[in-house]
Amino acid sequence: MENGEGTGPRLVVGAGYALYRGPLADSHTHRHAAFQVAFAPGAADPVPMVTATDGDGVRHRGAALVVAPMVRHRMEPVRELVTYFIDPHCAFADRLRAPGGPGITVAPQWRGLREEQVRPAGAQPSARVDPRLRAAMEAAGDDAVPLAGLAARVGLSPQRLRALAQEQLGLPLARWRIWRRLARAADALRAGSTPAEAALLGGFADQAHFGRRMREMTGLTPAAVLPALRPASGQARRAT
């Protein structure tokens, strides 16, 4: 089902979001260029909890957690986790940005979030992000274009573009570029490429570079998410 229900690891990539459901044996301390909504599926009585430890060592525990972009944290192991990564420049991110703040928020109202709730707003641009910044982020997937070129495309100076990204999204565009490279590499893995091939297709120097960046930004390794990415599982897909 599209909301992450069912059995077996799965990964869904849609416009403005990605959805992963699967086991989380362990994760490394990391920070990603997206909002994260995380909860454990299961019976409502008792409600299963998820726990994340932030960069200061503070533990946050609740029925669902919202992690803002670029917040250093580590998710504690859980038998099964549903996690959404929400692009910070899409309209759905506006619902997370206002109450959440720049940290980790216990947000039980998001437990049981369904993909069909995310999809319409995920495909729409945020009303709170400057259209020029949104355009630059869309173009940032082209690694051949330097920051100065991105800025020129949208009519801004490089300094102003950097400032907008920090002010409105809380992250540098360089981190967003890495995030997009990871998405490209994940697409390649899903299509059947080896990790080494996916690394090159994603724009990384080699497989080790790909693995380091994935662990740095998701807390996981390519090997850990491979079961959810392989089409043989019948679970990985692109949303339509």
Question: Residue ranges of each PLM-predicted region?
Answer:
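Alpha-helical bundle regulatory/interaction domains
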Residues: 1-160, 172, 190, 194-208, ...
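Alpha-helical DNA-contacting segments of helix-turn-helix folds
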Residues: 164-189, 213, 217-230
